Amino acid sequence: NAEEERRDEPDETDVEVEKRFFPNVASVPGQVLKKIFCAISKKC
């Protein structure tokens, strides 16, 4: 399936997993972590 084929791009796969994982499993803590990561990495 499509998700299996995307494993050719490891960096992107991690990002995709995080995008699915944080909103579903930990939406509020996930948003807090995103803001912290954003502030630290300055990628926003």
Swiss-Prot record:
Any single GO BP term: defense response to bacterium
Keywords of this entry: Amphibian defense peptide, Antibiotic, Antimicrobial, Cleavage on pair of basic residues, Disulfide bond, Secreted
Keyword check for Methyltransferase: no
Top-level taxon: Eukaryota
Annotated Gene Ontology cellular component terms: extracellular region
Function description: Antimicrobial peptide.
Entry-linked InterPro entries: Antimicrobial_frog_1
S-S bonds: C38-C44
Protein's name in the database: Brevinin-1PLa
UniProt propeptide residues: 1-18
Subcellular location field: Secreted
Organism field: Lithobates palustris
Tissues of expression: Expressed by the skin glands.
Main location: secreted
Signal sequence interval, chain numbering: none
Family: Belongs to the frog skin active peptide (FSAP) family. Brevinin subfamily.
